[in-house]
């Protein structure tokens, strides 16, 4: 079984003006596609062939892990975003954020700060720990919460390819616009899982 690039849940220009169609074309169409292609080439004829993406991530290392995790991380990231989204969460997500961080404003400030300070390439995540509390976790390179007992709820990609076309080296500007795209319905589904 080979993996395919999952379809975006919206048109390539749907996240503008926050994330341009050009960024999506390169980020999704080139970077994400390359991880899929590399993974398929790396697993061909190995014990990983025929396994799910999650199984590969949890049992591999090196190039296989890096490409599998990047395929999963990117697919998750695209679903964390939506046109006409953003704002503040409601319902159980709002309650969980308030219980863990005090307020949405405090959470947003802490998440943004963690993402800005995530050195180099990586991801910043909102996760639900096994005790039910929410936490902000930053991972480097292809790191993913799937290798832990935490449940990923939300992520932001802080690899430069995620924002360089639109924001150059200004990661804070990218993070400011990220909040206008957060798909809280997707976060709520992850929290309920």
From Swiss-Prot:
Reactions that this protein is recorded to catalyse: 2 superoxide + 2 H(+) = H2O2 + O2
Signal peptide: none
Induction (free text): The transcript is subject to small RNA (sRNA)-mediated degradation; sRNA RyhB-binding at the ribosome-binding site (RBS) both blocks translation and induces mRNA cleavage by the RNA degradosome over 350 bases downstream. RhyB blocks translation even in the absence of the RNA degradosome. Deletion of fur derepresses rhyB expression, and leads to less expression of this gene.
N6-acetyllysine modification, residue list: 51
Cofactor note: Binds 1 Fe cation per subunit.
Protein name, per record: Superoxide dismutase [Fe]
Organism, scientific name: Escherichia coli (strain K12)
InterPro entries, alphabetized: Mn/Fe_SOD, Mn/Fe_SOD_BS, Mn/Fe_SOD_C, Mn/Fe_SOD_N, Mn/Fe_SOD_N_sf, SOD_C_sf
Gene name tied to this protein: sodB
Pfam families: Sod_Fe_C, Sod_Fe_N
């Amino acid at each position: 079984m080979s993996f395919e690039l999952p379809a975006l849940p919206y048109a390539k220009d749907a996240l503008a003006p926050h994330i341009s169609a050009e960024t999506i074309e390169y980020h999704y169409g080139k970077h994400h596609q390359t991880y899929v292609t590399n993974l398929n080439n790396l697993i061909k004829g190995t014990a990983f062939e025929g396994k799910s993406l999650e199984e590969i991530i949890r049992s591999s290392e090196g190039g296989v892990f890096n490409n599998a995790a990047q395929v999963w991380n990117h697919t998750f990231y695209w679903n964390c975003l939506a046109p006409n989204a953003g704002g503040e969460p409601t319902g159980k997500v709002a309650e969980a954020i308030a219980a863990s961080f005090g307020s949405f404003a405090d959470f947003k400030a802490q998440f943004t700060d963690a993402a800005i300070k995530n050195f180099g390439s990586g991801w910043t995540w909102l996760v639900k720990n096994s005790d039910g509390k929410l936490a902000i976790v930053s991972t480097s390179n292809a790191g993913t919460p799937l290798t832990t007992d935490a449940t990923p709820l939300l992520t932001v990609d802080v690899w430069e390819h995620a924002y360089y076309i639109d924001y150059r080296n200004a990661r804070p500007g990218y993070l400011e616009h990220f909040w206008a795209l957060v798909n809280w319905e997707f976060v709520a589904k992850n929290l309920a899982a």
